[in-house]
Amino acid sequence: MSPQLILGWSTSDQSRRNWGHIMSRGNDRPMIETKALTKHFAQGKKLVEAVKGVTLDVAEGELVALLGPNGAGKSTTLRMLTTLLEPTSGSARIAGFDIAAARNEVRSSLGYVGQGNGAGHNQRVRDELVTQGLCYGMSKGDSQVRADELLGDLELTDLGTRKVSTLSGGQRRRLDIALGLVHRPPLLFLDEPTTGMDPQSRANLWDHILRLRREMGTTIVLTTHYLEEADSMAERVIVIDEGTVIADNTATALKADLAGDHLLLTFDSTDAAGVAASVAEQLVTVREVAVDANVVSIRAGEGDSTLTVLLRQADARGARALTADITRPTLDDVFLTLTGRSLRESAAAVAS
């Protein structure tokens, strides 16, 4: 059993009373609150600032993605919030409990699925889940019932008697998530949950995660460098780079506010393209205009309405477009706008 998942809380009666208190809490405060959270590491004679003053709130029931390249500070932030790392400075509360002063209560309030496989290779799948329940202070009977529930929820029932070492990568990740949910935590951290999985396995895993969230109302915070994952799954995206939060909003708002739509228009002459560019520069929604021969490239908010106005006004001045295309922005465009770097290229460079 991996220490990533069993975080070392007490299994005493007091711990179980604390758990009852957690479950009875109202919605009077955020599920996660951090203030100026930092983490520094000594690397030889050099001091590495992995996390630099992260301040954020996550409401109960939210699904939030921490997006950034490898080495941005995402996993370090999660490890501090799960009490696996002590912050250098700053503070944080989980379900109202301080991560430094109430470690047992914090640990009972969350499930954590790390990047590595958390289950013991020689254990049988169902036995691993039962053992996890016992470590949380559950009775053997309750642990067995909960194990069977999770096996069914994550389509692992037929694999319950198999050794963990015989599972496929996707099956192991589903087991990891089951381990994180044994004690029905109100908060689940997923650290790069689909790294290394093929697209079909990733989609299957997300189907399970989203279904369980709908049924249980669990708050989920995940780290990922998969842009599509953050864009399509998360209700809110927090972009982290070099240990700092550089953007925080819905994916739709980030793309609209920071990147904008890309309009590409072609004309029958360079003169006509120049006329269209001149018109575009006068529109308040247009952010950038570039002309290359008879092609005009525009970055603009509200791309559809901008294009309609642009085509009408350019045509009135004798510049009729031959073609006009709109490309919607991606979260990589957002990262590029914020940092001058591509998130895909940054992630690939670190990985290599």
Task: Name each model feature, range by range.
Residues 24-31, 39-53, 103:
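A short, flexible loop at the N-terminus of ABC-type nucleotide-binding domains that lies
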Residues 90-101, 106:
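Conserved ABC transporter NBD signature motif
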Residues 130, 134, 141-159:
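Conserved ABC ATPase "signature" region
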Residues 163-167:
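Conserved ABC ATPase signature
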Residues 184:
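Conserved catalytic motifs of ABC-family nucleotide-binding domains
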Residues 188-191:
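Catalytic Walker B motif of ABC-type/P-loop ATPase nucleotide-binding domains
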Residues 207-301:
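ABC transporter nucleotide-binding domain
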